[in-house]
Amino acid sequence: MLHPETSPGRGHLLAVLLALLGTAWAEVWPPQLQEQAPMAGALNRKESFLLLSLHNRLRSWVQPPAADMRRLDWSDSLAQLAQARAALCGTPTPSLASGLWRTLQVGWNMQLLPAGLVSFVEVVSLWFAEGQRYSHAAGECARNATCTHYTQLVWATSSQLGCGRHLCSAGQAAIEAFVCAYSPRGNWEVNGKTIVPYKKGAWCSLCTASVSGCFKAWDHAGGLCEVPRNPCRMSCQNHGRLNISTCHCHCPPGYTGRYCQVRCSLQCVHGRFREEECSCVCDIGYGGAQCATKVHFPFHTCDLRIDGDCFMVSSEADTYYRARMKCQRKGGVLAQIKSQKVQDILAFYLGRLETTNEVIDSDFETRNFWIGLTYKTAKDSFRWATGEHQAFTSFAFGQPDNHGFGNCVELQASAAFNWNDQRCKTRNRYICQFAQEHISRWGPGS
């Protein structure tokens, strides 16, 4: 919670003054106040920016956290209204109360204090401090206290702000009027009781579709709902171009990845380079990241043979891309399932394996297995690791369902080892495949 940068004595004095002068404008309408010339009353741009920033910072500091708190934007028209109301110096004007301002559904926070005692920033901070006396769970303020400044300040659906101040005279003393206007207004009542100003929950978890962005300043952890800067809520790095309609990054030469964040500088010694994955597809008989290693087929590691191809099921778990690299180091690829026959045999084998095979790495997250199929955003389709288009499919019911976020495919145990799209950082066991044409050219291993 923000506290004004004042001495303890001064802070206590401010609190006492607030209690004495009242916390609602209706309580401080002394008839002797007279309007003075507005020479120094209007806020300049710097003051407007500071007040707006403070409001948003305080709104993102509420406890419990707010799930639907909107970010406020400055409104010059509201600032003009606030300035005009401050110039009334507390005098009630029925025509304004019942006319245009009520039609606009504007909410008000207003304060009269001795001139020069506090800054506008300190006044707003003191409004927020009323929250110490407010119970969100009960939806009410402490007995004999008022929290209406606080509840309006943190009213979740208010999205526009404008403030003004004015110097008024009261006999020998000078009084300063501070006013902030909020739209849409808050502090609505049901059956005589003010409803809670916001919904409790994780920051930005209940933002509406029109404000689905989540604004976070650098110096705090809270979040405020805002109109998204782009509907994709993402940006492309390294001078990549974002296609707003497809939410895909078009990367410049030498970069790849969902956000063009991966620099591609590989040289494939015995193989071809796949720019979209920044990886090598090795020639027969070679493996490793750059296809520079001569490999030998490890016959003793074949778990099953299907139509001459060898399939090896790992006893360890890893992320998708690390699993793919481990298969390539051995001269193979992550399994490519291109027929119902291969799918049926693997599903049967893995089902039996669940109760018989030992796992040396107990840190795996699921009982699922990676295969060599990934979603390519640039092509808007799933492709095998070799770049081939996926013709045969065995996705489980309702899959794929991650819409570009689960880009890697696993055999899912809970779905009888049919396919599921999953986040590539998930740790699974995996299946390496050694094709028949590869095996025929490899020399015997040691």
Curated annotation (Swiss-Prot):
<keyword id="KW-0732">Signal</keyword>
<dbReference type="InterPro" id="IPR014044">
    <property type="entry name" value="CAP_dom"/>
</dbReference>
<feature type="glycosylation site" description="N-linked (GlcNAc...) asparagine">
    <location>
        <position position="144"/>
    </location>
</feature>
<keyword id="KW-0430">Lectin</keyword>
<dbReference type="InterPro" id="IPR001283">
    <property type="entry name" value="CRISP-related"/>
</dbReference>
<keyword id="KW-0964">Secreted</keyword>
<feature type="signal peptide">
    <location>
        <begin position="1"/>
        <end position="26"/>
    </location>
</feature>
<dbReference type="GO" id="GO:0005768">
    <property type="term" value="C:endosome"/>
</dbReference>
<dbReference type="InterPro" id="IPR001304">
    <property type="entry name" value="C-type_lectin-like"/>
</dbReference>
<feature type="domain" description="SCP">
    <location>
        <begin position="52"/>
        <end position="182"/>
    </location>
</feature>
<feature type="disulfide bond">
    <location>
        <begin position="251"/>
        <end position="260"/>
    </location>
</feature>
<feature type="domain" description="EGF-like">
    <location>
        <begin position="228"/>
        <end position="261"/>
    </location>
</feature>
<dbReference type="GO" id="GO:0005794">
    <property type="term" value="C:Golgi apparatus"/>
</dbReference>
<feature type="domain" description="C-type lectin">
    <location>
        <begin position="306"/>
        <end position="433"/>
    </location>
</feature>
<keyword id="KW-1015">Disulfide bond</keyword>
<feature type="disulfide bond">
    <location>
        <begin position="327"/>
        <end position="432"/>
    </location>
</feature>
<keyword id="KW-0256">Endoplasmic reticulum</keyword>
<dbReference type="InterPro" id="IPR016187">
    <property type="entry name" value="CTDL_fold"/>
</dbReference>
<dbReference type="GO" id="GO:0005615">
    <property type="term" value="C:extracellular space"/>
</dbReference>
<dbReference type="InterPro" id="IPR035940">
    <property type="entry name" value="CAP_sf"/>
</dbReference>
<dbReference type="GO" id="GO:0030247">
    <property type="term" value="F:polysaccharide binding"/>
</dbReference>
<keyword id="KW-0333">Golgi apparatus</keyword>
<feature type="disulfide bond">
    <location>
        <begin position="236"/>
        <end position="249"/>
    </location>
</feature>
<dbReference type="InterPro" id="IPR000742">
    <property type="entry name" value="EGF-like_dom"/>
</dbReference>
<dbReference type="Pfam" id="PF00059">
    <property type="entry name" value="Lectin_C"/>
</dbReference>
<feature type="disulfide bond">
    <location>
        <begin position="408"/>
        <end position="424"/>
    </location>
</feature>
<comment type="function">
    <text>Binds polysaccharides in a Ca(2+)-independent manner with a preferentially binding to fucoidan, beta-glucans and galactans.</text>
</comment>
<dbReference type="InterPro" id="IPR018378">
    <property type="entry name" value="C-type_lectin_CS"/>
</dbReference>
<protein>
    <recommendedName>
        <fullName>C-type lectin domain family 18 member A</fullName>
    </recommendedName>
</protein>
<keyword id="KW-0325">Glycoprotein</keyword>
<dbReference type="Pfam" id="PF00188">
    <property type="entry name" value="CAP"/>
</dbReference>
<dbReference type="InterPro" id="IPR016186">
    <property type="entry name" value="C-type_lectin-like/link_sf"/>
</dbReference>
<dbReference type="GO" id="GO:0005783">
    <property type="term" value="C:endoplasmic reticulum"/>
</dbReference>
<keyword id="KW-0967">Endosome</keyword>
<keyword id="KW-0245">EGF-like domain</keyword>
